[in-house]
């Protein structure tokens, strides 16, 4: 339990008074102000605006006081300790990342089970699998005592001798990049600061790499200030960051950002230009010299930002891209770099009935990943685009990986389902042979459970898949404790994949369900766009329909059904809780976007406008105001139990979203069920979170839901 110091308590007493307790959890009353904003003639109160200042003593005292109330409640739950024990047992298994090869060396990550961060390993051969003859390339567990410093990216040089790597602290999106000599295990003097939303791309000679960064933020604004005007640089080893070569920027458009990759032959820099968190982007290329890079002017291929253009490879002077231009479910196109006008693009692989979600070029073949009703299929095509075969996956689930270069003979992939942890497989590109490389051994027995795919009809007649995992022999009597998860945004597909939260809930006697709803990419760009902007309500309708289906089919009932989602999924949970509080027993929005009128004012929030729109537009204001979780809490209506989670260092979705939502929810008359907020200290949006914090937070979530449903956990 968090202990408040005397000084913190003194400050808390000044800003938080213990008023009449509307609910049994003993909330403090959060100070209100008379802040009112007017949007297109509509006045909107924002009484907790002061909570947006995460650096103020008042906000820090509020955080401490809220955490104390929450932890007292959680500590008293009989389900807390057994849930944590089960979660720890199921989390404690050896896990492997997907291997990749560079310069005659293989690289992969491994975690013994309860290590705070995954460790990067390397070996020149994988004849003995992923354990023997491996050397530690980089162990981030040595970078901090509490495990809060994580690897944000690793990129070996072409010869496999050097490793560019990014580190991030306390869950922040800000990264610092360094370079390690893999022969000595020592870091070079090079240090790159203020990197965000970028990786590194080495030149073929290994003398330097490309990366993107922002200007240093103003003092006190690192976690909240808006991120604009990203710039693309080349860093030459042995030089100061201040001497890096500026490759690309756009002084006339503050939203431009850059992603890079160098072609397999080292002759071309391919630049993806993004303007938002959506999938639409532009493309530029820059020929690279044989000698030292000293700069150059990128040549545009397309800067219309009208579709997705994902580089796959450069083959025979042609740039191969995966694109949804004139193909909502995507196609593979070939661009002649000497004549790159769109009119001359050739289709190598036409759009099919399933959504193409990934493409790689390995061993002279194209490996194309598709989703068929939210489960992975992988098809193999020749250099001419002709379909050759299909990768024989183990079952209905999710496969990922398949990386490599055009002249590689092998590639690796992972396969997982709701009840099977990720296995690592090797795929021989020429023969199509698959060999198992690593299969985790866990305390979870998948043979005791089954997963089935069902289809739900939404409010407007749209058909959507859901996946239900449960113990074999499930009784359909409405009594099953059921946890429904969703996301529904940014073209991100929700597919069946193993996670310890689901496994723990199943082990506790529950049913776990994921819903593949609009806003995601399960059926292509049209499916995504049907859940954006003025159509965002479709996302909520889909999720509500999934919940109603579970009740009608007697999988669950309103007293045994809980919902959960994070980030955009936190918005989903918040909105649906407001719209159908009668349908759920518990709701857990994690790091959610709750203030839809001001989200664009913080860090990278402006980039979400492609999915949400902004309150600056009158029509969008009306739509946003109609569902914004913060602005639609209904006083006088009985709400389910709510546990809000966030991190005090979240610089993706700033914690003020959750702070203001929690304060508003606690102040409203929403019935006796608890309305709590759990604020993780020294943690961010989720990436890089240490194992101990993951176990504590997620087991608390499951214990909270179980407690609400009076589920006994042994």
Each language-model region and where it sits:
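Gram-negative bacterial Sec-dependent N-terminal signal peptides
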Residues: 1-21
């Amino acid at each position: 339990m968090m202990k408040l110091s005397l000084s913190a308590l003194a400050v808390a007493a000044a800003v938080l008074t213990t008023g009449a307790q509307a609910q049994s959890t003993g909330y403090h009353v959060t100070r209100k102000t008379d802040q009112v904003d007017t949007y297109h003639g509509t006045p909107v109160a924002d009484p907790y605006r002061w909570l947006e200042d995460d650096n103020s003593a008042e906000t820090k005292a509020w955080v401490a006081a809220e955490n104390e109330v929450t932890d007292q409640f959680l500590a008293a739950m009989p389900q807390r300790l057994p849930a944590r024990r089960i979660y720890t047992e199921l989390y404690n298994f050896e896990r492997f990342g997907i291997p990749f090869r560079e310069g005659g060396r293989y690289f992969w990550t491994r975690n013994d089970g309860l290590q705070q961060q995954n460790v990067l390993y390397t070996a020149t051969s994988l004849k003995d699998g992923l354990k023997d003859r491996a050397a530690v390339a980089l162990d981030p567990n040595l970078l901090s005592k509490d495990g809060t410093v994580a690897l944000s990216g690793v990129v070996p040089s072409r010869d496999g001798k050097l490793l560019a790597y990014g580190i991030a602290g306390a869950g922040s999106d800000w990264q610092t990049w360094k370079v390690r000599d893999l022969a000595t295990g020592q870091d070079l003097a090079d240090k790159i600061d203020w990197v965000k939303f970028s990786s590194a791309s080495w030149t073929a000679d290994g003398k330097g790499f490309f990366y993107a960064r922002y200007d240093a933020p103003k003092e006190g604004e690192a976690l909240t200030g808006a991120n604009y005007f990203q710039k693309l640089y080349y860093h030459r080893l042995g030089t100061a960051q201040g001497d890096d070569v500026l490759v690309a920027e756009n002084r006339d458009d503050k939203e431009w950002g850059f992603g890079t990759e160098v072609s397999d032959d080292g002759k071309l820099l391919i630049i993806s230009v993004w303007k938002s968190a959506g999938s639409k982007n532009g493309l530029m290329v820059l020929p690279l010299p044989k000698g030292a890079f000293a700069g150059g002017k990128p040549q545009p291929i397309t800067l219309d930002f009208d579709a997705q253009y994902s580089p796959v490879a450069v083959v025979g002077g042609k740039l191969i891209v995966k694109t949804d231009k004139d193909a909502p479910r995507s196609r593979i196109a070939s661009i002649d770099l000497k004549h790159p006008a769109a009119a001359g693009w050739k289709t190598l692989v036409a759009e099919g009935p399933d959504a193409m979600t990934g493409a790689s070029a390995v061993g002279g073949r194209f490996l194309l990943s598709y989703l068929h009703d939210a489960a992975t299929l992988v098809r193999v095509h020749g250099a001419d685009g002709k379909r050759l075969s299909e990768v024989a996956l183990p079952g209905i689930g999710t496969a990922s990986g398949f990386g490599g270069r055009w002249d590689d003979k092998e590639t690796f992939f992972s396969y997982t389902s709701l009840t099977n942890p990720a296995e690592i497989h090797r795929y021989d590109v020429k023969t199509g042979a698959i060999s198992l490389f690593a299969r985790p051994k866990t305390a979870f027995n998948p043979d005791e459970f089954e997963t089935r795919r069902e289809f739900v009809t939404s409010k407007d007649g749209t058909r959507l898949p859901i996946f239900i995992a449960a113990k074999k022999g499930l009784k359909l009597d409405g009594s099953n404790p059921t946890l429904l998860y969703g996301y529904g945004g940014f073209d991100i597909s929700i597919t069946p994949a193993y996670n310890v939260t689901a496994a723990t809930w199943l082990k506790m006697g529950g049913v776990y369900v994921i819903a593949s709803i609009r806003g995601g990419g399960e059926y292509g760009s049209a499916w995504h766009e049907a859940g954006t902007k003025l159509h965002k309500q479709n996302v909520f309708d889909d999720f509500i329909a999934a919940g109603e289906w579970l009740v009608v089919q007697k999988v669950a009932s309103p007293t045994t059904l809980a919902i959960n989602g994070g980030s955009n999924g936190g918005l989903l949970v918040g909105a649906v809780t407001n719209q159908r509080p009668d349908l759920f027993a518990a709701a857990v929005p994690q790091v959610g976007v709750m203030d839809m009128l001001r989200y664009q004012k913080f860090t990278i929030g402006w980039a979400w406008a492609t999915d949400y729109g902004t309150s600056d537009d009158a029509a969008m204001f009306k739509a946003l105001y109609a569902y914004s979780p913060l602005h639609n809490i209904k006083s006088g209506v009985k709400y389910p139990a709510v546990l809000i989670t966030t991190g005090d260092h979240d610089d993706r979705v700033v914690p003020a979203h959750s702070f203001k939502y929690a304060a508003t929810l606690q102040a409203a008359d929403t019935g006796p069920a608890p309305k709590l907020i759990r604020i993780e200290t020294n943690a961010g949006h989720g990436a890089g979170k240490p194992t101990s914090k993951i176990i504590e937070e997620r087991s608390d979530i499951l214990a909270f839901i179980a407690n609400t449903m009076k589920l006994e956990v042994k």
